[in-house]
Amino acid sequence: MSRHKSKSIPGRNLRLADQIQKDLAGLIQRELDMSRAGLITLSGVELSADYAHAKVYFTVLGAEPDAAAALLNEKAGWLHSQLYKLLHIHTVPTLRFVHDAQIARGIEMSALIDRANRPGPAADEPDEPDEPEDRR
């Protein structure tokens, strides 16, 4: 009798995370009234190694990120039960919604780069000397 070590299937984590993101986006769009939370976009899903937990990253437009996260986390149990019906896997991860601040940071960094590249007087160029005043 041979023993087999349990090895995860290469790429399964990424495929499952993508499928969870796709299914959650559809459920949120079709089934939930998220008008109080603004426009929500799911930007990624990060699964734990045992698939028991998932961090779902989102961005929001037109509302406070904390309020949107609270509303999404309030609905996490219902979304989990709906995922169980859609995904045909043994363990459906517990969902935790987290605001994705990387996009906002990227926009800020882009603005800083644009400002630094703007044509204008360089900081290391000396100013033109003032004209001598007439001393009489």
UniProtKB/Swiss-Prot annotation:
Alphabetical UniProt keywords: Cytoplasm, Ribosome biogenesis
GO molecular function ontology, one term from the record: ribosomal small subunit binding
Lineage: Bacteria, Pseudomonadati, Pseudomonadota, Betaproteobacteria, Burkholderiales
Coiled coil: none
Function in brief: One of several proteins that assist in the late maturation steps of the functional core of the 30S ribosomal subunit. Associates with free 30S ribosomal subunits (but not with 30S subunits that are part of 70S ribosomes or polysomes). Required for efficient processing of 16S rRNA. May interact with the 5'-terminal helix region of 16S rRNA.
Main localization of the protein described in the UniProt heading: cytoplasm
Biological-process GO terms, alphabetical: maturation of SSU-rRNA
Subcellular location(s) per record: Cytoplasm
Name of the gene: rbfA
Key word Cytoplasm present: yes
GO annotation, cellular component aspect: cytosol
Assembly information from the UniProt record: Monomer. Binds 30S ribosomal subunits, but not 50S ribosomal subunits or 70S ribosomes.
SUPFAM superfamilies (alphabetical): Ribosome-binding factor A, RbfA
Record-stated family: Belongs to the RbfA family.
Chain intervals for the UniProt region annotation (Disordered): 114-136
Record-given protein name: Ribosome-binding factor A
Sequence ranges of Acidic residues compositional bias: 124-136
Pfam families: RBFA
